[in-house]
Amino acid sequence: MLFWHTQPEHYNQHNSGSYLRDVLALPIFKQEEPQLSPENGARLPPLQYVLCAATSPAVKLHEETLTYLNQGQSYEIRLLENRKLGDFQDLNTKYVKSIIRVVFHDRRLQYTEYQQLEGWRWSRPGDRILDIDIPLSVGILDPRASPTQLNAVEFLWDPSKRASAFIQVHCISTEFTPRKHGGEKGVPFRVQIDTFKQNESGDYSEHLHSASCQIKVFKPKGADRKQKTDREKMEKRTAQEKEKYQPSYETTILTECSPWPDVPYQANNTPSPSYNGSPNSFGLREGNSSPNHPVEPLPLGSDHLLPSASIQDAQQWLHRNRFSQFCWLFASFSGADLLKMSRDDLVQVCGPADGIRLFNAIKGRNVRPKMTIYVCQELEQNQLPLPQKQDDSGDNSLCVYHAIFLEELTTLELTEKIASLYSIPPQHIHRVYRQGPAGIHVVVSNEMVQNFQDESCFILSTLKAESNDGYHIILKCGL
């Protein structure tokens, strides 16, 4: 049976499983004790989260605790308020919103989080990384899980009342190891909780508190076996060696941390409990790793990134070129900083596909067209000329060629490119012919366009169409 105090207070772990009201001088908390002790007048964190799962005994002193979880098993997270309501002056709303995430602990995997989660999505269609067990949870309102953000859930709760959320983690740590030959050590995850209160507009976007802990997830019953193995190893150590390790505690206290980078500070529209909002609305960012900043629609463009670009200019350039998911990674990078990054650097940070694409975009590398041809207009007395396309010098005596870049290699594309070059409607060009042997006119088909030699030169000759409202274009071989 779970024991709950009538008044939420600051709880701490004890290796017997009970909760003490005073801060214990545990080795892992020695560095934090002065700032958490209420006697010295320091600020207590407004909230505290306790994961009801035992910590590993094989963790050295002054290292972060590690907790083993079983895949798919429901674990309770107790949501506690540290201060009495009379002292809770910075909480001006009855409800707060918490977002629980399962994220990578390793920095290397954080850089490629989007690619890692997308790969997991494709290998496990229809599954989620994190779920909330609603029937077991107590005191939470409006629980939601985005269909596109598989590793996060959110809900509302009242800090003055008993509240606990039961979570289930469905991915295991070895699913993200680079080599899978058996016996690999799984990568550690983090359970992070970010809590927000309402702002003046009623949105839950004002950050209140964040905390996290380190976990590893095993196949069903694997966490129990691992915990037993660690305990047996510690029992074999000498008393002197045991002093270098933390004792195992039956619960895990999440330690304060910075908010997750993609926290929706301004762009959150989750309704309050009294608001009848859309059931499909969801306050989380629709992507998996990038921040959701309020950005105005930006025009599409292939502009080059300049070394003189400021940090803000670099962020806007990333948005314009479809790299929004990496804006949080490059939040402090100027244009010069990005230009100094090598291809290998960007691949390591963004993953192979996006890293190469970002490198090409930064270096201004354009996609080479499938075919390039050069055209020049021929003027004769008995022809209806197209509007003149003059060169920069304005000298009409020169036969100036213009490049036409073809991608689809079709007659329609060729017609549209010629019409665009001479600023006439495409429907005014009725037919396109190529002058063949003995001056015959051959209809230009898709197959003929596909067999043009790259960088061929043509002189455009025009004939008046029979309907008197357009032209026929004749392609003559140029020099």
From Swiss-Prot:
Instruction: Share the domain note from the entry.
Output: The Grh/CP2 DB domain is required for direct DNA-binding. The Grh/CP2 DB domain is essential to maintain the undifferentiated state of embryonic stem cells.
Q: Among its keywords, does the record have Nucleus?
A: yes
Q: Where is this region: Disordered?
A: 219-248, 260-301
- Its transmembrane ranges are none
Tissue expression summary: Highly expressed in placenta, testis, small intestine, kidney and stomach. Low levels of expression in lung, mesenteric lymph nodes, muscle, ovary, and thymus. No expression was detected in brain, heart, liver, and spleen. Expressed in eccrine glands in the palm. Expression is prominent in both kidney collecting ducts intercalated (IC) and principal (PC) cells. Also expressed in the thick limb of Henle and connecting segments of the nephron.
Q: Where is this region: SAM2-like domain?
A: 261-365
Q: Does the keyword rRNA-binding apply?
A: no
The UniProt similarity line reads: Belongs to the grh/CP2 family. CP2 subfamily.
Composition skew (Polar residues), residue ranges? 266-292
Instruction: Describe the subunit structure.
Output: Forms homohexamers via its SAM-like domain. Interacts with Mta1; which is indispensable for Tfcp2l1-mediated self-renewal-promoting effect and endoderm-inhibiting action.
Occurrences of domain Grh/CP2 DB (ranges)? 43-280
Annotated InterPro entries: CP2, SAM/pointed_sf, SAM_3, TF_CP2-like, TFCP2L1_SAM
Compositionally biased intervals (Basic and acidic residues): 221-245
Disrupted-gene phenotype: Approximately half of the mutant mice die before weaning and show growth retardation during early postnatal stages. Mice display defects in the morphology of the submandibular ducts, abnormalities in the maturation of renal tubules and abnormal composition of saliva and urine. Leads to a decrease in the expression of pluripotency genes (Nanog, Oct4, Sox2 and Esrrb), while resulted in up-regulation of some endoderm (Sox17, Gata4 and Gata6), mesoderm (T and Mixl1) and trophectoderm (Cdx2, Eomes, and Elf5) markers.
Give the GO molecular function terms.
DNA-binding transcription repressor activity, RNA polymerase II-specific; RNA polymerase II cis-regulatory region sequence-specific DNA binding; RNA polymerase II transcription regulatory region sequence-specific DNA binding
The free-text function statement in the UniProt record for this protein reads:
Transcription factor that facilitates establishment and maintenance of pluripotency in embryonic stem cells (ESCs). With Klf2, acts as the major effector of self-renewal that mediates induction of pluripotency downstream of LIF/Stat3 and Wnt/beta-catenin signaling. Required for normal duct development in the salivary gland and kidney. Coordinates the development of the kidney collecting ducts intercalated (IC) and principal (PC) cells, which regulate acid-base and salt-water homeostasis, respectively.
Name assigned to this protein: Transcription factor CP2-like protein 1
Query: Where is it chiefly localized?
Result: nucleus
Q: Which gene encodes it?
A: Tfcp2l1
What Gene3D superfamilies has UniProt attached to this entry? Transcription Factor, Ets-1 (1.10.150.50)
Q: Which GO terms describe its cellular component?
A: cytoplasm; membrane; nucleus; transcription regulator complex
Q: Name one GO biological process term.
A: negative regulation of transcription by RNA polymerase II
Where, subcellularly, is it found? Nucleus
Region described as Mediate transcriptional repression: spans on this chain: 1-52
